[in-house]
């Protein structure tokens, strides 16, 4: 197994090294590189877009997975994740702060999320790892794991606490 891992690592290294050359064979010029600020802007905006535009329509929460081709062999396109949604909520707050959407639009999304969570399955206060976003019913994480997930609940609560602090003085 170690040899196989070594061979795969070497193959990846060789392929990566070959792919790094530009067409002229000369080093890239500084003008073709992103500045740190431009890179940060790009990462923040695209992260925001994933959670904003990619949200499950009913719940407003983050999808468990995204298939670029739109084909979901397990018919799970509407499955949402609790922990990933916590991260998504914080990304939306960053998007509001960066001006990608207004505070009002962000608040409307948060209200949709909280309304969903009020009715969604939970277990002694803990949310499951996954739900069906259209129903709020738990999607079992495994054969013997169909209840609350404390770690994922903590990630979700982090996001909701951040929302509380962000809007604590109103929507201004």
Regions found by a protein language model. Name each.
Residues 36-39, 43, 77-84, 148-155:
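Secondary-structure capping and boundary motifs in well-ordered enzyme cores
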Residues 26-77, 124:
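Low-complexity, Ser/Thr/Pro/Gly-enriched N-terminal "stalk/linker" regions
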Residues 63-79, 126-148:
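Carbohydrate-binding/catalytic loop surfaces
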């Amino acid at each position: 197994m170690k040899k196989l891992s070594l061979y795969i690592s070497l193959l990846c290294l060789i392929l990566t090294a070959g792919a790094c050359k530009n067409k002229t064979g000369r080093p890239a010029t500084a003008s073709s590189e992103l500045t740190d600020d431009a890179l940060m802007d790009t990462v923040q905006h695209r992260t925001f877009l994933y959670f904003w535009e990619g949200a499950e329509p009913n719940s407003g929460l983050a999808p468990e997975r995204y298939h670029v081709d739109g084909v979901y062999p397990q018919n799970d396109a509407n499955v949402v994740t609790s922990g990933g949604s916590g991260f998504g909520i914080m990304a939306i707050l960053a998007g509001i702060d960066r001006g990608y959407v207004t505070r009002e639009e962000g608040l409307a999304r948060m209200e949709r999320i909280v309304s969903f969570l009020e009715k969604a399955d939970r277990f002694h206060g803990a949310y499951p790892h996954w739900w069906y976003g259209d129903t709020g019913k738990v999607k079992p994480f495994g054969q013997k794991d169909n209840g609350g997930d404390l770690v994922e609940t903590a990630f979700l609560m982090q996001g909701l606490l951040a929302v509380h602090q962000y809007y604590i003085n109103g929507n201004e």
